């Protein structure tokens, strides 16, 4: 079957590495189930993706479907520094996107690829407005944990007390979740957060939460069972993770990296089993030089092999380029390897890797859990502090090295060394490894045929197909010709759209939007 005969979903991503990766993984999962998927994000990122990931012009076959890429200009010059300021960039992206995305969808329809559903990730909730204006259904992919989704939801609606300027250090008790200390709440919700623009960006999604017919989540039922069950009574949630595991297309050569990964697998091949500490703080966390130095000496003093990812900051980010202590690489010798970027999925699956020193972003957390990899938690801000709480205290797969930026504390080399050894040697290491392997098995079962996430993906695909048939049927029916305002008032919105978003929303009497399986 050619790609043009398949039901077509259109994925629109915010141009951040931590947003692109899970949405592209969702796209590959949907393609493997027999859909045509178009992935789009601004050209400034598309250029990097093409360079790093060998993305071609033709649709790539994945499982029973295809995935293709279209990128769009965001209206700013290539080197525009304002992209680093979300308060300036998000309005620009919305302004351009609301004009460009409808044109892209119209062009696809003219080329016999009519779009049946739009899917966005956080920071760009206006995509659901575009879908509504076109009479198309929309869905949203949430790229953090369900626990964090619940925290933001309760904050937005003022349902429980959160830290405030008058009560900075209060604990937060959310339904079906463990008690969160003030520094375990997503830090964007702190009254003193240095990132208020990120709080505003996240809250924007909750303003539009009534428009998507489904909220897809990169988690799985068995991992966050209680909070998923609770929030599913409020929002139309479908858990579809871990998205990076795709049984129907395990080796699909379609990636969303912005940098080409360095070759480190051959070096890992040369090391004994469970002997290497993997250190990576993701794509957006940058530590200060003095903390970098302490981590470096902690690694050396531990005597363990290590693979350390040191991603250089974007030139307009304002972060300094960090350096290693003088003579560090010479002292480490063949026991250490430093790279700018790594193929993290392969690294975490490698038998020589013993533990993962991580910032605890949700993508990295899911990859660690699903790979059976113990962690050393080094969160900094945002959802990372909440993820660290769950990794250490709930999922019990690691040890905590720090509590985040709110702690405002330099973690010394002796603490680094102690945590590394605790996670790799002795009874604690054996305990967290055993727990990690249990979560790996649960993750694999969730995405296997008939597993909880696989069933949810299939239900979503079936619903998109059902809505696609209804949309095409609606387009083929004769429409009433609206002659004047009085007639328009009589027919209402249904007369002004050639889609069926209102008819197919599936709302119940309480206004909750339900996904029909």
Swiss-Prot record:
Its EC number is 2.4.1.136, 2.4.1.120, 2.4.1.170, 2.4.1.177. It comes from the Eukaryota. GO terms for molecular function: 4-hydroxybenzoate 4-O-beta-D-glucosyltransferase activity; cinnamate beta-D-glucosyltransferase activity; flavone 7-O-beta-glucosyltransferase activity; gallate 1-beta-glucosyltransferase activity; isoflavone 7-O-glucosyltransferase activity; quercetin 3-O-glucosyltransferase activity; quercetin 7-O-glucosyltransferase activity; sinapate 1-glucosyltransferase activity. Keywords: Cytoplasm, Glycosyltransferase, Transferase. Disruption phenotype: No difference in the levels of punicalagin in pomegranate hairy roots in a single RNAi knockdown of this gene. However, double RNAi knockdown of this gene together with UGT84A23 leads to significantly reduced levels of punicalagin and bis-hexahydroxydipheynyl glucose isomers, and to increased levels of galloyl glucosides (ether-linked gallic acid and glucose). Optimum pH is 4.5. An anthocyanidin binds at residues 19, 382. UDP-alpha-D-glucose binds at residues 344, 359, 362-364, 367, 383-384. Highly expressed in leaf. Also expressed in peel, stem, root and aril. GO terms for biological process: 3,4-dihydroxybenzoate metabolic process; cinnamic acid ester metabolic process; ferulate metabolic process. GO terms for cellular component: cytoplasm. It is found in: Cytoplasm. It catalyses: 3,4,5-trihydroxybenzoate + UDP-alpha-D-glucose = 1-O-galloyl-beta-D-glucose + UDP; 3,4-dihydroxybenzoate + UDP-alpha-D-glucose = 1-O-(3,4-dihydroxy-benzoyl)-beta-D-glucose + UDP; 4-hydroxybenzoate + UDP-alpha-D-glucose = 4-(beta-D-glucosyloxy)benzoate + UDP + H(+); (E)-cinnamate + UDP-alpha-D-glucose = 1-O-(trans-cinnamoyl)-beta-D-glucose + UDP. Activity remains fairly constant between 20-55 degrees Celsius. Active even at 0 degrees Celsius. The active site is at residue 19. Gene3D superfamilies: Glycogen Phosphorylase B. Glucosyltransferase that catalyzes the formation of 1-O-beta-D-glucose esters with hydroxybenzoic acids and cinnamic acid including its derivatives as preferred glucosyl acceptors. Has significant activity with gallic acid (3,4,5-trihydroxybenzoic acid), 3,4-dihydroxybenzoic acid, 4-hydroxybenzoic acid, cinnamic acid, sinapic acid, coumaric acid, caffeic acid and ferulic acid in vitro. PANTHER family: GLUCOSYL/GLUCURONOSYL TRANSFERASES, UDP-GLYCOSYLTRANSFERASE 84A1. Belongs to the UDP-glycosyltransferase family. This is Gallate 1-beta-glucosyltransferase 84A24.
């Amino acid at each position: 079957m050619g790609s043009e005969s398949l039901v077509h979903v259109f994925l629109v991503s915010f141009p951040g590495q931590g947003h692109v990766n899970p949405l592209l993984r969702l796209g590959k999962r949907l393609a493997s189930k027999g859909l045509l998927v178009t992935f789009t994000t601004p050209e400034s990122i598309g250029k990097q993706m093409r360079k790093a990931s060998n993305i071609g012009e033709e649709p790539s076959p994945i499982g029973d479907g295809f995935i293709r890429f279209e990128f769009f200009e965001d209206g700013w010059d290539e080197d525009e520094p304002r992209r680093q300021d979300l308060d300036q960039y998000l309005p620009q992206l919305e302004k351009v996107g609301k004009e460009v995305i409808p044109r892209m969808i119209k062009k696809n329809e003219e080329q016999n690829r009519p779009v049946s559903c739009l899917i966005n990730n956080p920071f760009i909730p206006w995509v659901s407005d575009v879908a509504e204006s076109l009479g198309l259904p929309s869905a949203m992919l949430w790229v953090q944990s369900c626990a964090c989704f619940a925290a933001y939801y309760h904050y937005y609606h003022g349902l429980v007390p959160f830290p405030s300027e008058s009560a900075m250090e209060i604990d937060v008790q959310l339904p079906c979740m463990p008690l969160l200390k003030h520094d375990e709440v997503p830090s964007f919700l702190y009254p003193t957060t240095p990132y208020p623009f990120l709080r505003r960006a996240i809250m924007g999604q909750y303003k539009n939460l009534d428009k998507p017919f489904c909220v897809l989540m990169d988690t799985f039922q068995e991992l966050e069972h209680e909070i998923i069950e609770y929030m599913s009574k409020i929002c139309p949630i479908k858990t579809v993770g871990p998205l990076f595991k795709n049984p129907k297309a395990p080796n699909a050569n379609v990636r969303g990296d912005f940098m080409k990964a360095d070759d480190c697998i051959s070096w890992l091949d040369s090391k004994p089993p469970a002997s290497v500490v993997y250190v990576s703080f993701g794509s957006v966390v940058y530590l200060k030089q003095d903390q970098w130095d302490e981590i470096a000496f902690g690694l050396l003093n531990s005597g363990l092999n290590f693979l350390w990812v040191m991603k250089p900051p974007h030139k307009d980010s304002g972060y300094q380029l960090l350096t290693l202590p003088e003579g560090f690489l010479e002292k480490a010798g063949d026991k250490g390897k430093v790279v700018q970027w790594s193929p993290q999925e392969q690294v975490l699956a490698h038998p020589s890797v013993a533990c993962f020193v991580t910032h605890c972003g949700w993508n990295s957390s899911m990859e660690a859990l699903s790979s059976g990899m113990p962690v050393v938690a080094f969160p900094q801000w945002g959802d990372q502090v909440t993820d660290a709480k769950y990794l250490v205290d709930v999922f019990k797969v690691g040890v905590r090295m720090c509590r985040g930026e709110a702690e405002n504390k330099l973690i010394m080399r002796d603490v680094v060394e102690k945590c590394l050894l605790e996670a790799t040697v002795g009874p604690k290491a054996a305990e967290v490894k055993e727990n990690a392997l249990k979560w790996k098995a649960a993750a694999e079962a969730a995405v296997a045929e008939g597993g909880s996430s696989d069933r949810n993906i299939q239900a979503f695909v079936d619903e998109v197909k059902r809505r696609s048939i209804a949309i095409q049927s609606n387009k083929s029916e004769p429409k009433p010709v609206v002659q004047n305002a009085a007639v328009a008032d009589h027919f209402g919105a249904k007369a002004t759209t050639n889609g069926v978003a209102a008819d197919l929303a599936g709302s119940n009497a309480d206004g909750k939007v339900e996904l029909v399986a």
